[in-house]
């Protein structure tokens, strides 16, 4: 299947499309606050189009936890018939490029259901590592446990941004 993959903004006009995609793709449902917040994150939320058909989406938020600036991937998914066509790669690269351009993120992370081997493989190809497993992370789905996958965006020897010493 040859096709054109494009990313587009999430707007009040197409947020229902995002909602429908998420309902089909993910085993968990997201509340209205999730969608309200998604409209505020700008480039961190994108719909993915395959030949002008909305087939997937990525939604992230900035998270300040563990004394770090982290990017959290809330959702990244694509309808089953359109998988393995490079759409997920395009969405993840979009997010990684934002982090790279910004230059102040310590890492990027997400939760993946422990049984979702294809997602785990996908993220590991991009240098994500399983850093912990959260018991009973999900409600009402089995298995309820989630792996936390994380990709470090700084070399361990680099000082955190804003702490670079100025030469006199």
From Swiss-Prot:
UniProt record similarity statement? Belongs to the acetyltransferase family. GNAT subfamily.
A Pfam family for this UniProt protein?
A: Acetyltransf_1
Which sites bind substrate? 30, 74
Instruction: Please state where this protein is localized.
Output: Cytoplasm; Nucleus
Q: What is the stated purpose of this protein?
A: N-alpha-acetyltransferase that acetylates the N-terminus of proteins that retain their initiating methionine. Has a broad substrate specificity: able to acetylate the initiator methionine of most peptides, except for those with a proline in second position. Also displays N-epsilon-acetyltransferase activity by mediating acetylation of the side chain of specific lysines on proteins. The relevance of N-epsilon-acetyltransferase activity is however unclear. Required for sister chromatid cohesion during mitosis by promoting binding of CDCA5/sororin to cohesin.
Give the keywords, sorted: Acyltransferase, Cytoplasm, Developmental protein, Nucleus, Transferase
What is the protein's given name? N-alpha-acetyltransferase 50
CDD domains listed in its UniProt record = NAT_SF (cd04301)
* Keyword Thylakoid tagged: no
Q: What is its main location?
A: cytoplasm
GO-annotated cellular components: cytoplasm; cytosol; NatA complex; nucleus
Q: Which Gene3D superfamilies match?
A: 3.40.630.30
The record's Gene Ontology biological-process terms are: establishment of mitotic sister chromatid cohesion; mitotic sister chromatid cohesion; mitotic sister chromatid cohesion, centromeric; N-terminal protein amino acid acetylation; somitogenesis
- This protein's gene is called naa50
Q: What is the lineage of its organism?
A: Eukaryota, Metazoa, Chordata, Craniata, Vertebrata
Reactions catalysed, semicolon-separated, are: N-terminal L-methionyl-L-alanyl-[protein] + acetyl-CoA = N-terminal N(alpha)-acetyl-L-methionyl-L-alanyl-[protein] + CoA + H(+); N-terminal L-methionyl-L-seryl-[protein] + acetyl-CoA = N-terminal N(alpha)-acetyl-L-methionyl-L-seryl-[protein] + CoA + H(+); N-terminal L-methionyl-L-valyl-[protein] + acetyl-CoA = N-terminal N(alpha)-acetyl-L-methionyl-L-valyl-[protein] + CoA + H(+); N-terminal L-methionyl-L-threonyl-[protein] + acetyl-CoA = N-terminal N(alpha)-acetyl-L-methionyl-L-threonyl-[protein] + CoA + H(+)
Residues bound to CoA are 116-125
Record bears the keyword Electron transport: no
Provide the E.C. number(s) assigned to this enzyme: 2.3.1.258, 2.3.1.-
Q: Which residues does the annotation say bind acetyl-CoA?
A: 76-89
Residues of the active site are 72, 111
Species, as recorded: Danio rerio
């Amino acid at each position: 299947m040859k096709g054109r993959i494009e990313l587009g903004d999430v707007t009040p006009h197409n947020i229902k499309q995002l909602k429908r995609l998420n309902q089909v793709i993910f085993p968990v449902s997201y509340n209205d606050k999730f969608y309200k917040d998604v409209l505020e994150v700008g480039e961190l939320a994108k719909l993915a189009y395959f030949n002008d058909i909305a087939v997937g989406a990525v939604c992230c938020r900035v998270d300040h936890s563990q004394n770090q600036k982290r990017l959290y991937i809330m959702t990244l998914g694509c309808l089953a018939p359109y998988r393995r066509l490079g759409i997920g790669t395009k969405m993840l690269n979009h997010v990684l490029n934002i982090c790279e351009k910004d230059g102040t993120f310590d890492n990027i992370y997400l939760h993946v259901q422990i049984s979702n081997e294809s997602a785990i493989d996908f993220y590991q190809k991009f240098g994500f590592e399983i850093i912990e497993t959260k018991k009973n992370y999900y409600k009402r789905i089995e298995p309820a446990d989630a792996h936390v996958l994380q990709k470090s965006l700084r070399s361990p020897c680099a000082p955190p941004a804003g702490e670079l010493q100025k030469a006199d």
